[in-house]
């Protein structure tokens, strides 16, 4: 998959895959490939039959392409039913964004909060997924946010009169707690935090593991808000640190 069908690492992977198939004695290695691209003519020139090329529009940015045929690997790995649920969820959020009043419009409120922090000099935001199934979410959101809003000019090419995207970073659950949370609770930087958790775990052997994860997640948000005094300044938490907790069904 490559939007332009010229991406260096993608083409190198394709060449390696073809070589592997040929070494394995496959008579028609190109017939085992499927191309997903906004430049179908280049895929055909490469040697892939046009019936095995899945095109998508040039206007679809890479960071938004998951919901196009670029999502083929997800559909193959998770099943078409799961992929259709993903599409339905995206459509539901699109409708919410278009129809919900401003005071209850989640994307609008999130954008206003981001702008509020940026205009007050906050340069980073953190997101922590309290479920191993969401371990790649922070990396995905890094591309979604910083590639979308990381330029210093507007869509019309004019210099931006406000801060561009904040720097998004994060990690997974309790691993991050033992690595970076001291800075979030006690440091001099103000870092808005988003916690994402899942109501139901997938550990059928011992549900207590997931319960502990949720307790940790909720406790971190509460501690950021309330803080904790201590005689030893090194152990005190000032509180009044912003965070949002999102609990998925």
What do the predicted segments below correspond to?
Residues 1-249:
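A SIS-like phosphosugar-recognition module
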């Amino acid at each position: 998959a490559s939007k332009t069908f010229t991406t260096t690492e993608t083409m190198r992977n394709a060449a390696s895959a073809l070589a592997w198939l040929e070494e394995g004695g496959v008579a028609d290695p190109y017939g085992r490939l499927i191309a997903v691209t906004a430049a179908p003519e280049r895929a055909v020139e490469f040697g892939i039959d046009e019936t095995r090329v899945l095109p998508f529009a040039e206007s679809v940015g890479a960071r938004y392409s998951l919901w196009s045929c670029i999502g083929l690997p997800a559909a193959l790995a998770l099943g078409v039913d799961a992929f259709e649920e993903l599409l339905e969820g995206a459509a539901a959020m699109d409708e919410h964004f278009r129809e919900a009043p401003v005071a209850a419009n989640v994307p609008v409120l999130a954008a206003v909060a981001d702008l509020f922090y940026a205009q007050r000099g906050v340069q980073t935001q953190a997101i922590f997924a309290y479920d191993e199934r969401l371990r790649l979410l922070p990396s995905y959101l890094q591309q979604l946010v910083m590639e979308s809003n990381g330029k210093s000019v507007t869509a019309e090419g004019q210099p931006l009169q406000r801060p561009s995207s904040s720097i998004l970073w994060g990690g997974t659950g309790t691993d991050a707690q033992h690595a970076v949370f001291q800075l979030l609770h006690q440091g001099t930087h103000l870092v808005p935090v988003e916690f994402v958790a899942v109501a139901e775990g997938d550990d059928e052997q011992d549900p207590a593991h997931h319960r502990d994860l949720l307790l940790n997640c909720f406790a971190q948000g509460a501690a950021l808000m309330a803080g904790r005094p201590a005689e030893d300044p090194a152990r005190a938490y000032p509180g009044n640190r912003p965070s949002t907790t999102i609990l998925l069904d």
